[in-house]
């Protein structure tokens, strides 16, 4: 459990948030995402409508660009990684430059946790020195963009030429 360490680093690095609130969020939100997805089908036939004959099939998309904000630098990347792994996709996290250290630590801790389960080391990546240009390049190179942030970031995701999902104030 690295909730306290990550909370302290996030508050110190970003200058945002209350330490105790960050600890609680780090502990509770990530677990909530996991428990919400546990046992749910995310591959193959996930629904069949006998009446209409329609079959819903889920498959991996490829590489996900996970754009994360400085306001939630731990739980947002962790959640995006959980979603990507559940759907058998690779993910590259592009943290906000003002939260790069704490976000990178969170990503690397997740990599350490999943490695014993056979998850390839490069399936989860993080941009260590993020910038607007690197994030834009990532969005153009990936298969889908999942962006959390303000209006300029979400607009950039929607303008990337890739399928994009925007969440946050810019949505």
Feature locations, PLM:
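A glycine-rich helix N-cap at a beta->alpha junction
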Residues: 112-126
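Redox-cofactor binding/interface segments in oxidoreductases and associated redox assembly factors
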Residues: 19, 66-69, 146-147
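Conserved small-residue-rich beta-alpha loop and adjacent elements
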Residues: 42-113, 161-162
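Alpha-helical elements of the RecA-like P-loop NTPase motor core of helicases
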Residues: 8, 75, 104, 136, ...
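Conserved NAD(P)+-binding/catalytic subdomain of aldehyde/semialdehyde dehydrogenases
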Residues: 63, 126-171
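N-terminal Rossmann-like NAD(P)+-binding subdomain of aldehyde/semialdehyde dehydrogenases
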Residues: 1-55
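Flexible, glycine/proline-enriched loop segments at strand-loop-helix junctions
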Residues: 68, 92-101, 122-125, 141-144, ...
């Amino acid at each position: 459990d690295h909730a306290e360490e990550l909370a302290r680093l996030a508050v110190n690095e970003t200058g945002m948030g209350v330490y105790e609130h960050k600890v609680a969020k780090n502990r509770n939100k990530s677990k909530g995402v996991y428990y919400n997805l546990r046992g749910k089908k995310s591959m193959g036939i996930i629904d069949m409508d006998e009446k209409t004959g329609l079959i819903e099939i889920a498959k991996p998309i490829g590489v996900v660009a996970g754009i994360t904000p400085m306001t939630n630098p731990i739980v947002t990347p962790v959640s995006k990684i959980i979603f990507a792994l559940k759907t058998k996709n690779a993910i590259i996290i592009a943290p906000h430059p003002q939260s790069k250290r704490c976000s990178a630590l969170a990503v690397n801790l997740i990599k350490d946790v999943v490695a014993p389960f056979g998850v390839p080391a490069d399936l989860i990546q993080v941009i260590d020195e993020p910038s607007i240009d690197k994030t834009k390049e990532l969005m153009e190179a990936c298969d889908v963009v999942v962006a959390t942030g303000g209006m300029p970031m979400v607009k950039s995701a929607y303008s990337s030429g890739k399928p994009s999902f925007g969440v946050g104030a810019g949505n």
